[in-house]
């Protein structure tokens, strides 16, 4: 997946130019016959979206996601409530605009020339490319030329349909495809994994997140170059909503909120390792059920799944692990650290987990209050890995190089510099393996995303199977029958507890239309 960057310069320039051009329509509160006035009179901003791991999702009824978070802040900016309608596919989203059922579409939609003929785009905030995917072990196409409708299926309203049509007319006359009116891109990727479908096309971000749970999904080839992602609103000559959006995004850019949201949802790294992800998910099935009670017992300020991800990064959940430098155990503690924590046996899993949590809490307590709450854990983990003194150096170096020392996105970019003499020679605490600390935190974030998504996928599958069995055996409750037939369901029973503090999780939902009020 190509590295994603929010287009801050573009947002700022576009906001300035359009604010001037649209100035006559900006006094939103003074007119009763414009779109902003209507939204404020109604008291709610109506946003239509779709369930994807990045765009909009829920845990325990609590919504989150990149587009949801931005939409909620925009509603707050306008002083109204947010009403979210979830649709099954992109085609239904644009139906909402056409029928007057939505003010905005916030769903990771790509900007293209066909859409802007009929709808008003907002500022772009990240970019994606469209990619053809297949299942590992199956035939990998090197070109679209010979694909047929029996092999290639895409979601309705997908932006790539226009690209496919152009390719058919100019380069691949034999190319054909089918549009499945009942499924979205995530469901079609599931069909590829399950062998029901040979190929589909999705955007690079969706694919990257999907692979964290389904590593057997592979990219065959890029269909397009990077394309900007934006929101859409009605194109009706009323520019008040567009002006408000530009002002909002420009303000978010200037105060650093856009950068923090990018880091939260897109900052976990681009590199996908098929073997490593597959090995990790196998360990989730084989090893984690025995360790889960310990992680739950000692996880206090952090989610137990984050603690599990840390332990896997440290030792691959091996209580007997030993490194050449002498660190040992589940949490790979040094002898001195273990002694300071009162640990008598570093290879005892419970002692090691307990000690590791206390040491991490100590690092957390040292992180300055100026660091945003949901980023403090990443600073603490880097300090856990390389020592808090070197974290102080990293923050100081960030400030000296015109970055924000309270922003994890800025600080992590400077971590590798701690091992380069031109930089560490001028720092208080000298040389550090900053590149290792960078990789350490990024790996933990990847394992965390995989773990949460995989557990939710397992829970969904077990629940669906239990419900099916309940239909066959109506005298037995679905829950008890599921636990009897699928013991893994007991392990998963609490896996959907609150997980919104530190980063987004994954849930490849099959829900159709629904509405949420916030």
Curated annotation (Swiss-Prot):
What are the GO cellular component annotations? cell outer membrane
How is this protein named in the record?
Membrane-bound lytic murein transglycosylase F
What is the relationship between pH and activity here?
A: Optimum pH is 6.5-7.0.
* Region called Non-LT domain, residue ranges: 22-269
Role played = Murein-degrading enzyme that degrades murein glycan strands and insoluble, high-molecular weight murein sacculi, with the concomitant formation of a 1,6-anhydromuramoyl product. Lytic transglycosylases (LTs) play an integral role in the metabolism of the peptidoglycan (PG) sacculus. Their lytic action creates space within the PG sacculus to allow for its expansion as well as for the insertion of various structures such as secretion systems and flagella.
InterPro entries in the cross-refs: Lysozyme-like_dom_sf, MltF, Solute-binding_3/MltF_N, Transglyc_AS, Transglycosylase_SLT_dom_1
NCBIfam families according to UniProt: PRK10859.1
Q: Which gene encodes it?
A: mltF
Membrane topology value: Peripheral membrane protein
**Lineage, uppermost ranks:** Bacteria, Pseudomonadati, Pseudomonadota, Gammaproteobacteria, Enterobacterales
Its EC top class is: lyase
The GO terms describing molecular function are:
peptidoglycan lytic transglycosylase activity
């Amino acid at each position: 997946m190509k590295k994603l960057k929010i287009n801050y310069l573009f947002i700022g320039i576009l906001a300035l130019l359009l604010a001037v051009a649209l100035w006559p329509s900006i006094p939103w509160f003074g007119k009763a016959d414009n779109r902003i006035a209507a939204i404020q009179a109604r008291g709610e901003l109506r946003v239509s979206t779709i369930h994807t791991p990045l765009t909009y999702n829920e845990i325990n009824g609590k919504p989150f996601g990149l587009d949801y978070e931005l939409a909620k802040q925009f509603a707050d900016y306008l002083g109204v409530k947010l009403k979210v309608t979830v649709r099954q596919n992109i085609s239904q989203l644009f139906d909402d605009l056409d029928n007057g059922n939505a003010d905005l579409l916030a769903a990771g939609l790509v900007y293209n020339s066909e859409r802007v003929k009929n709808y008003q785009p907002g500022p772009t905030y990240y970019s994606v490319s469209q990619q053809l995917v297949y299942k590992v072990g199956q035939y990998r196409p090197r070109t679209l030329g010979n694909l047929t409708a029996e092999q290639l299926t895409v979601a309705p309203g997908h932006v790539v349909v226009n690209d496919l049509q152009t390719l058919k007319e100019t380069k691949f006359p034999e190319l054909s495809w089918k549009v499945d009116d009942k499924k979205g891109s995530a469901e079609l990727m599931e069909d590829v994994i399950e062998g029901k479908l040979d190929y589909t096309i999705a955007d690079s971000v969706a694919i990257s997140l999907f692979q964290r749970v389904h590593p057997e999904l592979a990219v065959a080839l890029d269909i397009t170059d990077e394309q900007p992602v934006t929101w859409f609103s009605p194109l009706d000559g009323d520019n008040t909503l567009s002006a408000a959006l530009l002002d909002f995004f420009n303000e978010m850019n200037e105060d650093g909120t856009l950068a923090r949201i990018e880091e939260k949802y897109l900052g976990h790294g681009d590199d996908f390792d098929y073997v490593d992800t597959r090995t990790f998910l196998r360990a989730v099935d084989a090893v984690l059920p025995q360790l889960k009670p310990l992680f739950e017992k000692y996880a206090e300020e952090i989610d137990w799944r984050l603690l599990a991800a840390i332990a896997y990064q440290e030792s691959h959940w091996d209580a007997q692990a030993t490194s050449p430098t002498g660190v040992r155990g589940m949490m790979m503690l040094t002898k001195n650290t273990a002694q300071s924590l009162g640990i008598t046996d570093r290879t005892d899993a419970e002692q090691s987990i307990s000690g590791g949590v206390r040491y991490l809490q100590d690092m957390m307590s040292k992180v300055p209050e100026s660091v945003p709450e949901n980023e403090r854990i990443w600073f603490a983990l880097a300090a856990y890995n390389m020592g808090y003194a070197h974290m102080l150096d990293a923050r100081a170096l960030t400030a000296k190089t015109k970055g924000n020392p309270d922003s994890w996105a800025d600080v992590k970019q400077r971590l590798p510099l701690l091992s380069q003499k031109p930089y560490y020679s001028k720092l208080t605490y000298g040389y550090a393996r900053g590149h290792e600390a960078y990789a350490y935190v990024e790996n933990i974030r990847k394992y965390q995303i995989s773990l949460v998504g995989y557990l939710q996928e397992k829970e969904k599958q077990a629940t669906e199977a239990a419900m099916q069995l309940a239909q066959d055996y109506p005298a037995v409750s679905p829950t008890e029958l599921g636990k009897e037939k699928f013991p893994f369901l007991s392990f998963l029973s609490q896996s959907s507890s609150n997980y919104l503090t530190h980063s987004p999780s994954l849930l490849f939902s099959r829900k159709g239309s629904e509405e949420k009020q916030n």
